[in-house]
Structure formats: C-alpha cells, structure tokens
Amino acid sequence: MAGELLQPCGMKQVHLGEAVLELLMQGAHNSSYGAQDNVCGAMATLLLLLLCLLLAIRHHWTEKDHVPGPCFLLGLGPLLSYCRFIWSGIGTASNYYNSKYGDIVRVWINGEETLILSRSSAVYHVLRKSLYTSRFGSKLGLQCIGMHEQGIIFNSNVALWKKVRSFYAKALTGPGLQRTLEICITSTNTHLDNLSHLMDARGQVDILNLLRCIVVDISNRLFLGVPLNEHDLLQKIHKYFDTWQTVLIKPDVYFRLAWWLHRKHKRDAQELQDAIAALIEQKRVQLTRAEKFDQLDFTAELIFAQSHGELSTENVRQCVLEMIIAAPDTLSISLFFMLLLLKQNPDVELKILQEMNAVLAGRSLQHSHLSGFHILESFINESLRFHPVVDFTMRRALDDDVIEGYKVKRGTNIILNVGRMHRSEFFPKPNEFSLDNFQKNVPSRFFQPFGSGPRSCVGKHMAMVMMKSILVTLLSRFSVCPVKGCTVDSIPQTNDLSQQPVEEPSSLSVQLILRNAL
C-alpha cells in the first residue's frame, strides 16, 4: 500500500548512509570557501589601514607640521640647542642652524620653541605683520638693564611701545632730520680738528673710538643738548652693552644662583642709567631757566610728557638711554667696517671720490647734494648687506599663524636671520663685496637692513643721512689707511647681539693722511 501511495509522486528510495555522507561532503566544501573569504577580508582590511596610514603621513608632511631642526630626544635636543646659543652667541648659533638645516629651522631657547628664518619670503611675512610686534628675551635679564616694558628696543608691552615710539618718530623725522646734516658736518670736523688726544705714539688713531665720539656727540646735540664727557659716557655705554648681550637670553636660575654675577651686571647697567638720569636732570634745569622754547628736542618732549603723567620717570630715563646708545654701537661700527671695505676695494674708493668732486664741485655739503651720491649710497647698501653689524632681529608671535606652510603657535619665538638672507641668490654676486649687487633697484623683500613694517627701525632715514654726511666729510679731508693686512675678514669679531670687532689696538688703529698731502 505504501508503494502505491509513493509511486505517483515519482520519488526514489535512498539509503540513509548515502544521504548523510553527501550532506557532510557538501558542508566541508562550503567551509573551505568560507575560510578563504575570511582571509581575503582580513588582508583587504590591513591594506586599507596601511593606505590610510600612508595618506595620514603624507598629509602630515604636506601640512609641514614638522619643521626641520634638531631632534627633541627626550629633552636633550632643546638643552643642546640652548647651550649653543648661550656659548657661541645668538648670531653665530643662528647661522649654524640655518647652514645645517635650511632657511627655516626649529630650535629651542630656554625651553621655548624658536624658529630661525632666513628665507626672504618668510622674513618679509613676519616683518610686515603686526602679529609679530613683540620681542622675546629673559624677563629678569631685561629687568636688569631696564628694558622690560620700557623704552623702545625690547619693550614688548605693545600699547606702551606704540606710545613711546611716537616720540622717537617725531625726533627722527621732520625738523630733527633737517638739522642732522649740519650737526653731523660740524661734529665730524670738530673731532677731526682735535685728533691729537686720540693718537698713539706712532701717530695712529683708534678709528672706532673716533667714530664713537663723533656719533655720541651728534646724538647729544640732536636729542639731549647738555654738556657731557664723551669718553666717560662711552665707557659706561660699552659696559651696558656687554651686560645687555650677556643677560638677554639667560635662564632664571642664572640670576638666582650666580647672584654675584647678577650683582655685577646690575651695577654695570646702573652706572649708565644713573649717568643718563643726571643728564636728564641737567636738561630739566635748563628748561626751567629758559625764557622761551624755540624748538623742543627729544628729551624735552619726554620731560613734558612725564610732567603731564603720560610717562614714568624710569621710562623717560630708558627712552633717553636707548636713543643715546643706539648709534655708538651700531652706526659707528658700520662706518668702521665701511672704511675697511673701502681700503680693500680701492677702485670703489676712487669712484666715490670722483662722485664727491662732481656733486660738490667745491661747494659745502648741502641737503640737496645727498640725492646725487648714487655710488656712495650703493656702497653703503652693499656694506650693510655684505657685513652688517646687526644681522638678525628677534620677535614673538602674538597669535597662531602659518609661515610658508608651517604652523606657528602663539608665543613662538622668531629669529629673523637677515644677514644670511642678504646672501641669497637674488644678488648677482651674493658672497662677494660688489657694487654690482645694487646696480639695479633691489625689492625690499630681499634687502632689509633696517627692517620694515610696524616695528621697523624708526631712525632709518636719519641713519642714512648721518652715514653719508660723516663719510663725505671724513673722506674729503683724509685718506684712512688701516694696518697692513687688516681687513673685515681678518680682524677678530664676535657675533652675539651684533657683529663687533674684538677691540685690539692692532686692528683698530689707522693712519689718517691728509688728502692734500697725497
């Protein structure tokens, strides 16, 4: 009966053992395919993760988060880079790192991230932005020399810096600038007429000391206007400057542990501060006794601002101090290097003398003549490019920024290595002293001897007038003959806060020979 019932359905009879075996075989076959699928899926996932990692690394380097420079190495890198700055000086260390790592480098000074820039576009970016109007330096060091939130040079209180800068701008432009030429000529001639007290037994003159005396006298006549002892004041300025570059980036522990050195530095700085305070008091008495004020100079303007409560006594003193010291240790040394370069390049000296004769034509030097000294101006610019006294400037970022694709965080220190930037391939002969480098107009982004932007040197126009007038007056009367073999490259120099000659008589003494005696 069962057979009858099943027959219409067309079903076959199958043994149970065969059915089970077939099922197991099919399961085993499906399992092998599943294992292969799992392996392929895992490999695909790993490849995808690797691709994502490579893309992340590429993005990281494309965004330039990693600035070239020494490695961190658990804090050893920051320590070693800071020691190099302390040991060799800021200028020398900056040149070392730019030479080793390129034109944008990250180092550390006192544990703070610091960028050293010598690429012209990066330097120009920083100079022109108000984001970088602050400077960096040791707070205790700046307090030691009276520059912390006072004066103009290292004052990082931007609001107060802007206020005092207006006094400098007024003194260094307008009527003050118009008086500069006459005062420079008078002062230079006066000192050249009285060379005997600067001559040694061989009849040679300490030319750097002569230039410093001329420049400090000019500064006094322009900005202070009281009797002073030039040599005594210059000695105090020299000690103040040494203290300045010694304490500028020292760590706080230096001032606490090396208290005897701190006391010495404070005493050296205080000597000049007291001398300036005494000169300001002389000026105050002079103003009190004056029946009328024909023209107020820089110090008089500051004294009146103090009397109206606009400035503190300490800030007035620091402003006058910085105005008086600025030229003797920058402009006078620049002139010293220029005189050496002239003797190294007699063809350039001859061209300048011929230009002087053509422009002056036997007449006294006047303002109208200055624009005619094209060769002289090219010589001054090339000297400032080839061997600058101040070859870097220090800034601090007031907010986050991006420089050449690199992220810069707020508070990052910036060193603009302008001296190295001036050796760029833009100039026809970047590593040579040649007037060909200024045969054509040079865009400001490639040549920044006085900086640019909101914190540029406020006295750059007056500095050019002073250099031209002093050089023309000196060269029209004397030929400057250094000791044989004395060149810009051969004399010992330091490069910390600025490039300065080591003051040895053998390298600073020159023979001044009258032109009409040649």
UniProtKB/Swiss-Prot annotation:
Pfam families: p450
Keyword Acetylation: no
First-level EC class: oxidoreductase
Expression across tissues: Ovarian specific.
Cofactor: heme
Binding site for heme: C457
Entry EC no(s): 1.14.14.14
Membrane topology annotation: Peripheral membrane protein
Gene Ontology molecular functions: aromatase activity; heme binding; iron ion binding
Domain of life of the organism encoding this protein: Eukaryota
Physiological role: Catalyzes the formation of aromatic C18 estrogens from C19 androgens.
PANTHER family: AROMATASE, CYTOCHROME P450 FAMILY 4
Full protein name: Ovarian aromatase
Phylogenetic classification of the source organism: Eukaryota, Metazoa, Chordata, Craniata, Vertebrata
